[in-house]
Structures are given as C-alpha cells and as structure tokens.
Amino acid sequence: KNTDLILDILKERDIKATFFVIGEYVRKHPETAKRIAQEGHTVGIHCDVHDYNLLYKSADSYIEDFQKAYDTVREIMGVEVKLFRFPGGSVNAYNKTVCREIVERMEEQGYIYFDWNASLEDAVGEKQAQELIANAKATTLDRKKVVLLAHDRVTATAQCLNELIDAFPEYQMKPLTTKIEPVQFKRFWEK
C-alpha cells in the first residue's frame, strides 16, 4: 500500500528513485514489485530475508541470501541487478567480522554497494511526517550529493513524500546507477 502510494507520487512528479528490495516482499507483492521496474526506477538488492543474525553469520550466508533475492528479482521483476545495500549499512554491529570478505566477493562479481549520507530516520519507531522531514533536513547538511535513506514500508514516509520533495528544491532527484560514485561508509579495514 505504501509502496504504491510512493510510486504514484513519483510518477506524478516525474521522479525516478532507487528501490533496494527485499526478496521476501517481492514474492509477497509481485505486482507492486513489477511496477517499480516497469516505471523505470532503479532496482537494487537489500536482502532476501531481513534477519541480521542469519545474514551476517558468514560471508557465505550473506551471499546465499543475496543470490536468492537476486533470483527472485530477476524472475518476478525481470531486471538484472548490480546494486545492493547492506541491511543496517555496510558498517554495523552485526557484520564487523564478515563485511570485508562480503565486499571483496561481491565486488569481484561486479556488484556495487551503496550506503547513505542522509536519512529520514524512519526505520525504527513510529514517527510523524514532520519529524521525518526535519530528520532529512538535519542530515543532508547542504551536501552537493545526497543519498537519502527512506523506507517504503513506513506510512508516514509515504504520507510526507510530496512535502519532502518540495523541501529540497535545490536538488535534482535521480536514481542511483552503476555510473554514479557510490556513497559508502568508511571501510573500517582500509586506512
């Protein structure tokens, strides 16, 4: 429901976005998933099942989960995916011991991961639309290039999307691609 509302708004505003999808949700909502691709949005993989303990148990478990999501996206949405986003971001408390190996193996296969440098902070808790917009403004920090994290499953995010877009007239909103230099958290294993 929220994703369809977001897609309606993006279509009305002629804006393309990037959706990092969860394979489990693609299987549960195939028509909405197909619509994302059919309307020209960039599709990336988030995961298949959003379970940090399972995902980050090992590099193999992460890649197995990714492959299942990838196969689902290819089968249902009809797109080949090259972008992915780590659940919790590339640097989090769950993946410290496996992140480096995951990144190396995924990059060897030609995948690119994106993190974010601004956020609605909508992943946890029930927030009102105005709070989400304030979070976006506070975390954008007048950067020239912003990758804003938002979650389509959150009702307030869908409800405030038009106002959120209007709050940033100075930005050209466009989807992530393989040609854009990715925003990535500092690779803690690199100096």
Feature-to-residue mapping (PLM):
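Active-site beta->alpha N-cap acidic-glycine motif
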Residues: 1-80, 163, 167, 180-181
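Residue-level recognition of the N-termini of beta-strands and the immediately preceding loop/turn
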Residues: 80-82, 145-146
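Conserved beta-strand segments of alpha/beta enzyme cores
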Residues: 42, 112, 172-174
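Loop/helix-junction capping segments adjacent to catalytic residues or to phosphate/diphosphate-binding pockets
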Residues: 1, 26-30, 123-126, 155-158
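Short low-complexity, flexible loop/linker segments enriched in glycine and/or proline
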Residues: 33-36, 58-61, 129-132, 187-191
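Alpha-helical scaffold elements lining the catalytic groove of polysaccharide deacetylases
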Residues: 5, 51-77, 90-144, 159-160
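A cross-domain feature marking catalytic cores of carbohydrate-active enzymes
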Residues: 19-24, 45-47, 85-88, 117-118, ...
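Terminal accessory/targeting
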Residues: 4-18, 75, 117, 130-131, ...
